[in-house]
C-alpha cells in the first residue's frame, strides 16, 4: 500500500521521469529482452535490436500505462484493469515477466535520472512498481 509520502515521492520523481519515459520504457524493454531471453517469446515478430521502432512503439505503450498509473495513484488497479485483462485473457503473458520489466524499469530510471533518486524515493518507486505489477496480474485468477 502506498503511503501519502510514497505518493508524493512518486509524483515528484515522475515530474522528471515524464519527459524521458518513452526512452526509459524502451530501454527497460531492451534490458529485459537481454537479461531474460524467454521474455522475447511474446515479441517473436519484433526486431529486438536496440533503438528499433517496434521496441520504441511498445515502450510508448508501457510509458502510457505508467503515466496513467501515476495520474491515478489512489486507483491503480481500476486504472490498469483493462490492461490486466488484455495480458491475462488475450495475450496470456506469463506474469513473471511483469516482475522482470519492473526491475528493468528501476534500473533504467536510475541510469537516466540518478540525480533525482534518494533512498526514500527509490523505496517509494519500488513500492509503486510493485503495486503496478500486482494489479496487472489481478485478472489472472
From Swiss-Prot:
GO terms for cellular component: blood microparticle; haptoglobin-hemoglobin complex; hemoglobin complex. One of its GO terms (molecular function) is heme binding. PROSITE patterns: GLOBIN (PS01033). The keyword Heme applies. Keywords: Heme, Iron, Metal-binding, Oxygen transport, Transport. Residues 1-141 form the Globin domain. One of its GO terms (biological process) is hydrogen peroxide catabolic process. SUPFAM superfamilies: Globin-like (SSF46458). Heme b binds at residue 87. O2 binds at residue 58. Red blood cells. Involved in oxygen transport from the lung to the various peripheral tissues. The major hemoglobin component (HbIII) is a heterotetramer of two alpha-2 chains and two beta-1 chains. Belongs to the globin family. This is Hemoglobin subunit alpha-2. It comes from Varanus albigularis.
Amino acid at each position: 500500500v502506498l503511503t501519502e509520502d510514497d505518493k508524493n515521492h512518486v509524483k515528484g520523481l515522475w515530474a522528471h521521469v515524464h519527459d524521458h519515459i518513452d526512452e526509459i520504457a524502451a530501454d527497460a524493454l531492451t534490458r529485459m529482452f537481454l537479461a531474460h531471453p524467454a521474455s522475447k517469446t511474446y515479441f517473436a515478430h519484433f526486431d529486438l535490436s536496440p533503438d528499433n521502432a517496434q521496441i520504441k512503439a511498445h515502450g510508448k505503450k508501457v510509458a502510457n500505462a505508467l503515466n496513467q498509473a501515476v495520474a491515478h495513484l489512489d486507483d491503480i488497479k481500476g486504472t490498469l484493469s483493462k490492461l490486466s485483462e488484455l495480458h491475462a485473457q488475450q495475450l496470456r503473458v506469463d506474469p513473471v515477466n511483469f516482475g522482470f520489466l519492473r526491475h528493468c524499469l528501476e534500473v533504467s530510471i536510475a541510469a537516466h535520472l540518478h540525480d533525482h533518486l534518494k533512498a526514500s524515493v527509490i523505496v517509494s518507486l519500488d513500492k509503486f512498481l510493485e503495486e503496478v505489477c500486482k494489479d496487472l496480474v489481478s485478472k489472472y485468477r
